[in-house]
Design a protein with these regions (language model features):
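Conserved core of the sugar-phosphate nucleotidyltransferase
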Residues: 7, 11-13, 17, 41-129, ...
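Hydrophobic helical membrane-anchoring modules
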Residues: 132-133, 138-167
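Conserved N-terminal catalytic core of the sugar/cofactor nucleotidyltransferase
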Residues: 1-29
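Glycine-rich "substrate-gating" loop/helix at the edge of Rossmann-like oxidoreductase active sites
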Residues: 2-5, 38-40, 136-138
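Short beta-strand-to-loop acidic/aromatic patch adjacent to the donor-nucleotide binding site
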Residues: 27-41
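Short, high-confidence coil segments that cap the C-terminus of an alpha-helix
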Residues: 28-30, 57-61, 158
Protein backbone atom coordinates (compact mmCIF):
# COMPACT_ATOMS: atom_id res chain seq x y z
CA UNK A 1 0.00 0.00 0.00
CA UNK A 2 1.05 3.60 -0.65
CA UNK A 3 1.06 4.51 3.05
CA UNK A 4 3.96 2.13 3.70
CA UNK A 5 5.84 2.63 0.43
CA UNK A 6 8.84 4.86 -0.12
CA UNK A 7 12.13 5.76 1.51
CA UNK A 8 10.65 7.65 4.47
CA UNK A 9 8.75 4.67 5.89
CA UNK A 10 10.45 2.60 8.59
CA UNK A 11 11.04 -1.11 8.21
CA UNK A 12 9.07 -1.59 11.41
CA UNK A 13 5.93 -0.12 9.80
CA UNK A 14 6.32 -2.48 6.83
CA UNK A 15 6.82 -5.42 9.20
CA UNK A 16 3.71 -4.52 11.20
CA UNK A 17 1.68 -4.40 7.99
CA UNK A 18 3.14 -7.73 6.80
CA UNK A 19 2.45 -9.33 10.18
CA UNK A 20 -1.16 -8.15 10.12
CA UNK A 21 -1.66 -9.51 6.58
CA UNK A 22 0.05 -12.84 7.38
CA UNK A 23 -2.10 -13.30 10.46
CA UNK A 24 -5.23 -12.64 8.40
CA UNK A 25 -4.16 -15.07 5.69
CA UNK A 26 -2.99 -17.90 7.96
CA UNK A 27 -5.54 -17.24 10.74
CA UNK A 28 -2.75 -17.44 13.33
CA UNK A 29 -1.11 -15.05 15.73
CA UNK A 30 2.69 -14.94 15.46
CA UNK A 31 4.76 -14.26 18.57
CA UNK A 32 8.15 -13.88 16.86
CA UNK A 33 9.02 -12.13 13.61
CA UNK A 34 12.27 -12.74 11.71
CA UNK A 35 13.22 -10.09 9.16
CA UNK A 36 15.93 -11.08 6.67
CA UNK A 37 16.79 -7.93 4.79
CA UNK A 38 17.06 -8.56 1.02
CA UNK A 39 19.87 -6.01 0.70
CA UNK A 40 22.16 -8.23 2.82
CA UNK A 41 22.64 -11.23 0.54
CA UNK A 42 25.84 -12.70 2.02
CA UNK A 43 24.44 -13.89 5.35
CA UNK A 44 24.12 -17.65 5.48
CA UNK A 45 21.91 -20.21 7.18
CA UNK A 46 24.36 -20.57 10.08
CA UNK A 47 24.16 -16.82 10.75
CA UNK A 48 20.38 -17.12 10.93
CA UNK A 49 20.44 -20.21 13.17
CA UNK A 50 23.02 -18.70 15.54
CA UNK A 51 21.08 -15.43 15.76
CA UNK A 52 17.87 -17.34 16.52
CA UNK A 53 19.64 -19.41 19.19
CA UNK A 54 20.99 -16.26 20.84
CA UNK A 55 17.54 -14.67 20.67
CA UNK A 56 16.04 -17.67 22.47
CA UNK A 57 18.84 -18.09 25.04
CA UNK A 58 18.99 -14.43 26.07
CA UNK A 59 15.22 -13.99 26.41
CA UNK A 60 15.56 -10.59 24.79
CA UNK A 61 12.77 -8.53 23.22
CA UNK A 62 14.56 -8.22 19.92
CA UNK A 63 17.89 -8.96 18.29
CA UNK A 64 19.93 -7.00 15.77
CA UNK A 65 23.05 -8.00 13.85
CA UNK A 66 26.23 -6.17 13.02
CA UNK A 67 29.97 -6.44 12.54
CA UNK A 68 33.22 -4.80 13.51
CA UNK A 69 33.36 -1.34 11.93
CA UNK A 70 35.82 0.24 9.55
CA UNK A 71 35.60 3.52 11.50
CA UNK A 72 35.13 4.41 15.15
CA UNK A 73 33.05 7.42 16.27
CA UNK A 74 35.45 8.03 19.18
CA UNK A 75 38.46 8.27 16.88
CA UNK A 76 37.95 8.80 13.16
CA UNK A 77 34.38 9.84 12.43
CA UNK A 78 33.51 13.51 12.27
CA UNK A 79 30.47 15.71 11.98
CA UNK A 80 30.31 19.24 10.66
CA UNK A 81 28.03 21.78 12.33
CA UNK A 82 28.13 25.45 11.44
CA UNK A 83 31.38 24.89 9.51
CA UNK A 84 33.00 23.44 12.64
CA UNK A 85 34.48 19.92 12.58
CA UNK A 86 34.31 17.65 15.63
CA UNK A 87 34.62 13.97 16.52
CA UNK A 88 31.19 12.31 16.48
CA UNK A 89 31.36 10.68 19.92
CA UNK A 90 32.97 12.97 22.45
CA UNK A 91 34.79 11.57 25.45
CA UNK A 92 36.86 13.00 28.29
CA UNK A 93 39.55 10.46 27.42
CA UNK A 94 41.58 11.02 24.24
CA UNK A 95 41.96 8.10 21.89
CA UNK A 96 44.99 7.96 19.62
CA UNK A 97 44.14 4.79 17.70
CA UNK A 98 40.96 3.13 16.54
CA UNK A 99 42.10 -0.08 18.25
CA UNK A 100 42.24 1.43 21.76
CA UNK A 101 38.97 3.34 21.33
CA UNK A 102 35.82 1.90 22.92
CA UNK A 103 34.51 -1.10 21.02
CA UNK A 104 31.66 -0.23 18.65
CA UNK A 105 29.86 -2.10 15.89
CA UNK A 106 28.22 -1.36 12.56
CA UNK A 107 24.62 -2.47 12.36
CA UNK A 108 24.47 -4.51 9.17
CA UNK A 109 20.70 -4.71 8.59
CA UNK A 110 21.02 -8.43 7.88
CA UNK A 111 18.86 -10.12 10.51
CA UNK A 112 16.27 -8.62 12.83
CA UNK A 113 14.31 -10.80 15.23
CA UNK A 114 11.39 -9.36 17.16
CA UNK A 115 8.99 -10.48 19.83
CA UNK A 116 5.61 -9.19 18.75
CA UNK A 117 5.31 -6.74 21.66
CA UNK A 118 8.77 -5.32 20.94
CA UNK A 119 7.89 -4.68 17.30
CA UNK A 120 4.90 -2.64 18.44
CA UNK A 121 6.95 -0.67 21.00
CA UNK A 122 8.36 1.45 18.12
CA UNK A 123 11.92 1.29 19.49
CA UNK A 124 14.62 -0.55 17.58
CA UNK A 125 17.02 -0.57 20.53
CA UNK A 126 15.93 -1.03 24.13
CA UNK A 127 17.46 -2.35 27.34
CA UNK A 128 16.38 -5.84 26.22
CA UNK A 129 17.91 -5.75 22.72
CA UNK A 130 20.46 -8.48 22.01
CA UNK A 131 23.29 -8.25 19.50
CA UNK A 132 24.70 -10.96 17.25
CA UNK A 133 28.07 -10.29 15.63
CA UNK A 134 28.60 -11.42 12.05
CA UNK A 135 31.85 -11.36 10.09
CA UNK A 136 32.47 -8.26 7.98
CA UNK A 137 32.58 -10.20 4.73
CA UNK A 138 28.96 -11.30 5.23
CA UNK A 139 27.78 -7.96 6.61
CA UNK A 140 27.66 -5.84 3.48
CA UNK A 141 24.34 -4.04 3.11
CA UNK A 142 23.71 -3.08 -0.52
CA UNK A 143 22.78 0.60 -0.46
CA UNK A 144 24.84 1.79 -3.41
CA UNK A 145 26.47 0.65 -6.62
CA UNK A 146 29.85 0.30 -4.86
CA UNK A 147 28.23 -2.02 -2.27
CA UNK A 148 26.84 -4.16 -5.09
CA UNK A 149 30.23 -4.31 -6.79
CA UNK A 150 31.83 -5.34 -3.49
CA UNK A 151 29.30 -8.18 -3.01
CA UNK A 152 29.78 -9.38 -6.59
CA UNK A 153 33.56 -9.32 -6.09
CA UNK A 154 33.28 -11.40 -2.90
CA UNK A 155 31.03 -13.95 -4.63
CA UNK A 156 33.47 -14.14 -7.55
CA UNK A 157 36.37 -14.69 -5.13
CA UNK A 158 34.45 -17.43 -3.31
CA UNK A 159 33.77 -19.18 -6.61
CA UNK A 160 37.39 -18.84 -7.75
CA UNK A 161 38.59 -20.45 -4.50
CA UNK A 162 35.82 -23.06 -4.58
CA UNK A 163 34.34 -21.78 -1.32
CA UNK A 164 30.73 -22.86 -1.03
CA UNK A 165 28.27 -20.13 -0.22
CA UNK A 166 25.27 -21.33 1.75
CA UNK A 167 22.89 -18.44 1.43
Amino acid sequence: PKNIAGPKVSDEEVLKHSLKEAEKKFKKKFDVIVDLDPTSPLRNINDIKKALNKFIKTNCDNLITGSKPYKNPYFNMIEIKNKSVSIVKKSKKKYYTRQNSPKVYDMNASIYIWKRKALYSNNLITKKTAFFEMPRERSIDIDSKIDLLQVLSIIKEFKRNNIKIKI
